[in-house]
Amino acid sequence: MNFPWDQLLVKGNWMITMAQIGAPFLVIGLIAVITYFKLWKYLYKEWFTSVDHKKIGIMYLICAVLMFVRGGIDALLIRAQLTVPDNKFLESNHYNEIFSTHGVIMIIFMAMPFIFGLWNIVVPLQIGARDVAFPVLNNVSFWLFFAGMILFNLSFIIGGSPAAGWTNYAPLAGEFSPGPGVNYYLIAIQISGLGTLATGINFFVTILRCKTPTMKFMQMPMFTVTTFITTLIVILAFPPLTVALALMTTDRIFDTAFFTVAHGGMPMLWANFFWVWGHPEVYIVILPAFGIYSEIIPTFARKRLFGHQSMVWATAGIAFLSFLVWVHHFFTMGNGALINSFFSISTMLIGIPTGVKLFNWLLTLYKGRITFESPMLFSLAFIPNFLLGGVTGVMLAMASADYQYHNTYFLVAHFHYTLVTGVVFACLAGLIFWYPKMMGYKLNETLNKWCFWFFMIGFNVCFLPQFILGLDGMPRRLYTYMPSDGWFLLNLISTIGALLMAIGFLFLVVSIVYSHFKSPREATGDNWDGLGRTLEWTTASAIPPKYNFAITPDWNGYDTFVDMKEHGRHYLDNHNYKDIHMPNNTPVGFWIGIFMTIGGFFLIFETVIPALICLFGIFGTMIYRSFQIDHGYHIPAAEVAETEARLREARIKEREAVSHES
């Protein structure tokens, strides 16, 4: 084994040196706290090895929030560098590393786990399922994601981060990027991508096979519908990325030449592979976000969603078109007029089903009895801001005009107006909306609204000036500029906006901490003043019982739960409980994640033998699992009856309290 020790530490940058010093203390402090409070056994038994979809969802959300912080710090460093002209705060390569990691973290390690966390918590409950179709695979999927996340974040302090942009184009990411940085990108995303693909398959089967028998596809809640269609995109889009990452890994480690022109390779092959995955990836995070808005808007408008079936078809149309637009990411790379025209038209077409969704949300609001809780505020702010992102997207879809906009800050502003308002607003709204389902209490609404106003205003202050900067010719990925360029004032305003967004996020963190100690607990499950419209609100809070539903609920129409509440009925009115079979926890995913992390680390530094040993460890873990005789366990009917009696009693008390107040 010839490990490249000389590449291990990044030298010559004060910021990275401070991180290298601080990171070990942070890890030691975390270990000390867990040891002091004797939490190791609890965490391992109840969380790390859990196959309960709700606990796995919470672990995804914790990781997503942490990555939001990491990606947000990267964004603030970018804005700090560009605040004034000729700034020496960051040198050029460090700046390249920061904007490269910012993009990867926000898409792969923040937005996706945020969405997957909400999938895990909400979808099985919305369809009346006891668990996902493959509980053990669900645990493995999380630890594959976690392994990729850890590896990618190690790059900042060990070996150096990737600096070829989040798109990692060849040949820049090939012979022109020596060192382990790009290897971190390839291996971390590959491992995380395997977990994502497994999650897509798992939830596709879960929705198809585990939903309550009375629930028809066109009657499913929109969040579940968007999840189902998104899983199809995941299953179709991630294999090309897997192939592309594998090919570039062999180029860099085993000296193949798939993307090296001098040896007969083709750099444009990477661009096509990447964007065949990359543009559907946008809809992998956007479509579930649309589903979140489609749950929140009817709830706080006190109306059923307008045009439910048209929303389903619009979602399917967007998913189909998402695979026909990838070339619009490189109109300027010499494809020719015919190809550019085809992809220009297909890109514009995607605005039609998206417009259907926008009009349906507006018509849902029409004549609704709207209340402005913080999830609703994020949902309402999404509509006009996302519209601006969509309109500028249509502008970019015009191939001839794209020659002016391409690789300028106009493009940066466009995709932030789509991804931040479309995805981040939805993630924050969904977190607040379903937080009482997870924890049994609502986040403080005053602090939530401060979060919303700072974040929303800061977002527009930050990114609206970037449209003007782009039209004025400021290139993206530029680490500095001269005073004579005339970009100082707008960059200063943009940085102020980024600081306002950071303050808004801090209000959310304060809300989480404050609410943990101060918010009243609500055991009834229908936590938003009885406004819930779907099956997850029929179950108890916090964290519904492991079995979710004591009996299989009926779902005879989109407003089944609303009708039940209006007539004073509940699915628990049937008291004929039986023993419930549940799967046991398993350490398989946890240990596969450890082997993946260690093996991936050695492969990043091109040390193949230890990586192969870890690969054998993964196979050994899988063989161990295959020879286990594990039939799960049963929750006795008496225990189920006791649990459900407590929920029924809490609901009766709540109903009596409401009647007394009225």
Swiss-Prot record:
Kinase found in the keyword field: no
Cross-link for 1'-histidyl-3'-tyrosine (His-Tyr), residue positions: 279-283
Pathway: Energy metabolism; oxidative phosphorylation
Transmembrane segments: 14-34, 58-78, 103-123, 140-160, 187-207, 228-248, 273-293, 311-331, 336-356, 376-396, 415-435, 451-471, 493-513, 587-604, 608-627
Main subcellular localisation: membrane
Alphabetically ordered keywords of this record: Cell membrane, Copper, Electron transport, Heme, Hydrogen ion transport, Ion transport, Iron, Membrane, Metal-binding, Oxidoreductase, Respiratory chain, Transmembrane, Transmembrane helix, Transport
Gene Ontology terms describing biological process: electron transport coupled proton transport; oxidative phosphorylation; respiratory electron transport chain
GO cellular component: plasma membrane
Enzyme Commission number, as recorded: 1.10.3.-
Residues binding heme a3: 414
Pfam families, A to Z: COX1 (PF00115)
Reactions performed catalytically: 2 a quinol + O2 = 2 a quinone + 2 H2O
Reported function: Catalyzes quinol oxidation with the concomitant reduction of oxygen to water.
Protein name, UniProt field: Probable quinol oxidase subunit 1
